[in-house]
Amino acid sequence: LSDQKRIIYGFDSFEGLDEEWISTDYNPKGKFSLSKKQPNLPKNVKIIKGRVEETLENFLKENKNKIVFCHLDLDNYSPTKFVLQKIKPQLFPGSILLFDEFYGYQNWKDQEYRALKETFKEDEYKYIAFGKRQASIEIL
């Protein structure tokens, strides 16, 4: 984030989860809300406020650059699948995708993991790193 020459784009509603999510505990719709308040961020970080399903398509039409890195912290299947389908044409060999809640909790195979498996063939990516629940892939 400190490289002021590169613009980092983020998408957030600041309203929390748009549907319930069960990890190790129950997280109801709206959990993780920031009460629509945007945090203070460096000048090179631009936030597109609103639900990603309502903001991403127009952003991608206006910004046709290739996507080098995408951190997906959408928790649930539906928004993750939506984003993956929309950004796929702008990915290239070497693009990195980081999934924040990829595995290691109840029903994980029905969420971000499922969205990845339904959007990409096995030979289109490789796993490059794993964290507690996170996974990173590189587009081939």
How should each PLM-predicted stretch be described?
Residues 1-140:
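S-adenosylmethionine/decaboxylated-SAM
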